[in-house]
Amino acid sequence: MNKPIAIFDAGLGSYTIVEAIKKTYPQQDIIYFADRKSFPYGAKTIEELKTIIEKSVDFLLEKGASFIVLASNAPSITVLDKIKNKNKVIGIYPPLKNVLNDRRKNTLIIGAKVMIESSELQDYIKREVGDYCKQFHVENASPLIQLIESGDFINNTEETEKTIRNFIDNGENKFGKLDSITLSSTHLPWISSYFKKIIPEVKLYDPADNLVKAIKNYTNIGEGKIHSIISESEKYTAKEFLKILDILKIKLDYEII
């Protein structure tokens, strides 16, 4: 592999980033690290996340990564600026300036619990949009993320649609009629088709779009290979993760650690 870019998070979410980068830079070599041993990021404390991310970055640099994509909104917002070797890493963030540029007026930022409840997210919103911060609301989307990790969004479409519909209804009951949603967990684009069906008038923002543009200067011409590494624990095994990938018709060249 020629100067591979590593892409990682705790599981399925980061594969959407692998696909987005591969589509734009087809000759880029990629190391895809699904850190199931640390799943779920969204339920960790900030200190736990910092330790996990630092260890993962060190591991991927040892594996030969020339640059690293932290493909998870929660640690990007809460801990990325606090870790060593942060100059070798780019994170993924809610694209709030894009929302403002499109003149949207009532936006829901949805993502993992640890990010949604963090002061770091509120600081980020204020930095990005200033006085417009009052038109941005936040909501814990952990129940939706679980639908993806379990594979239920494929195996049980009726229940998935019901869960998402209830989630949207609850959000609009709290914050009024929405005109935009940022899918601020890399898992959530897997269920964007459900959102489009239920609320077709609401614009969805995928943070991956900005990330793909941002890494352009770090890409290289290689062979277009993807090497996958899957960590596992007793609770979250590689075997179960591979079953979900199989349902999604994703085939990997992988090693298990």
Q: Whereabouts are the PLM-identified features?
A:
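Non-catalytic structural scaffold of enzyme domains
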Residues: 1-257
